[in-house]
Amino acid sequence: MRLPFFLFACLLLLPCTVTTAAAPSVQMDDIARFWSTYDAVLAEPDAAQRVALVRQHYVEPGSAGLHALMKVRNYTAAEYAQAMLAWPRFWASVRPLTANARHASATLEQDLAVFHRLYPALRPASITYAVGVLRTGGTTLGDQVLIGAEMALGDASVDVIELPEPLRSRLRVFYDSAPGANNAQNNLHEYVHTQQRETTGSLAQYAVREGVAEYIAERISGRRPALPLYAYGPLHESEIRARFRAEMDGDALDNWLYNNARNPFGVSDVGYYAGYRIAQEYMRQQPDEQAAIARMIELDYSDPVAVRGFIEASGWLPQR
C-alpha cells in the first residue's frame, strides 16, 4: 500500500503532528425529551403537577446545554408548562420541524473545517439543540452554542396566531424567512460568538460584534438570513450610516438590535446590517484574509476605543 507523502514524512521524522479541526459535539436529545414531556403535560389537569412534570421529565434529566439555555434566557419550568397549554396551534405546527435538527446540521463538520482553515486558532465548542420558549433561536454561554429549536428550525408553516403582540408580528417575519433552511449559517454565527470576547457598552460595540459573526458565517456557509434587514439595508444605506454615526456611542439599542419593526427604520435588527457592512468593508481592504479574520475575531469588543478604531479602519462611515 502506498502511503500519502505527508504520512510517510511523519513516519520518518517523528514526532509529527497534523492539525485539524476537532469533530463538533452536537447534542439533540433534549428535543425528544421536550415532546414526551409536552404530551404528559397536556394530559395532566392539575397546574402544579404540570410544572412538576416539566421539572422532572425535561429540566432535571436535560443536557448541560439545556441548563445553560435556561440560565441565559431565564426560562423556568412554570413558564414552559404555561406555554405548552397556551399555544397548542403553535406547538403542533413546530413539532415536526424540530425533527430536522440532524439534517439541518449535516454540514457542520465540513463548515468547521473551513472555519479552522480560515482561523487556525479556532477553539472547540459544543452545540445543543433544545426547545425553549421563544426568546432565542441561538445564543452562547462560554464554549457552548445553544440553539432554540422551536425558532431556529422553523419555516413559514409555523402558526403564530396564538402568540401575543409584538411577538406575533416579529415571529411571523422571522418564520417567513425560513430559518430552518439557514441553520448552517445560524450555527456558524453562534460558533463565531464562542470565539469572540463578550461586550457591554455602546451600540457600536454590540453591532460590530454581531456584524463580524454575520460576515464570517456568510463567508463559510455562502448564506445569510433571508430577513428584511438585508433587503432594506442596501436601499437605505445613507440613512443607516448617518443615524448609526449619531447613535453609535450611546448605549440605547432599541432602534437597532434585538427589537421588532416598531422603530424608525420599520425593520427589525438593522444593527446587524450596520455591523455586517463594517466587517465587509474592513475585509475588502485586507490583503491577508486569515490575518484579518483573526483581528476581527480577537478584537476587544469590551473596549470602545478599539471598536471605534476598527470602524474607522473599515471606511464605512461617512466623514463628518
Specify the residue positions occupied by each region the protein language model found:
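Positively charged n-region of N-terminal signal peptides that target proteins for export
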Residues: 1-4
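Bacterial N-terminal signal peptides
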Residues: 6-16
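Post-HExxH zinc-binding segment in Zn-dependent metallohydrolases
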Residues: 24-39, 200-245
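Acidic helix-start/capping segments at beta-turn-to-alpha-helix junctions
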Residues: 55-62, 126-140, 233, 299-302
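Acidic/His-rich structured neighborhood in mature extracellular/periplasmic domains
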Residues: 82-222
